Amino acid sequence: MGILNRRSIGIVSIALFALALFASPAAAAKKTFQDSDDAKEANEPAKFLPDYDKLTKGKDADWVYFPDGSLKKYRTVEVKEFVENGKGREARHAAEAGKEYMEQWLEKAGYKLAEKGAELVIEGNVFNAWEPGTGARIWGGWMANPGVGLEVVAKDSSGKVVGEIRHKTRGSTIDDAVENALEEVAEAISDGR
């Protein structure tokens, strides 16, 4: 083995060690909502969920917190009417569609709907809903689509919070954006992540 090969192996070994040393803490730390750009949006109130500081990056939804893990153990669910703390008629319109779409997607996920006495109670809030401006519509693209930002709290029958979700998405209309968002929220509820 020549001297050049020994140096190459040594340099590569040191580089891999340094990479492992510096990359592992960054990979181990979960990204939290409070440290994200989403938390800094001035026009998107963060006043509905009890624990914004515990939200972490989710698999199906943007930000999630499930203190006890998966919610699959709950079989019956009651969905309350959604509220809105976002500004404008778009947020009100999105909140009006929330309950129906949440029920639809939870039912598809295998939950049984109940009017009262359910094992799981879902409350929702629309913190932002928007229609793109005329310029965006002319230029097109995904950013030209309407969107919605919503939050969901899941409580057990005793009122204990068992899940919190904050999620934003887009669609061809505000209603479509609400449906898309709540489909992903229902998947997050079912998976517990």
Where are these regions (language model features)?
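Compositionally biased, intrinsically disordered linkers/stalks adjacent to structured regions
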Residues: 174-193
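Bacterial N-terminal signal peptides
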Residues: 12-21
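Structural recognition of the beta-strand scaffold that forms the well-ordered cores
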Residues: 78-79, 162-164
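Generic solvent-exposed, charged/amphipathic alpha-helical segments
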Residues: 99-107, 182, 186
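Bacterial N-terminal signal peptides that target proteins for export
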Residues: 2-13
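N-terminal signal peptide c-region/cleavage motif recognized by signal peptidases
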Residues: 23-25
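Surface-exposed short loop/turn segments
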Residues: 31, 104, 108-160, 166-168, ...
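A structural "domain/chain start" motif
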Residues: 27-100, 193
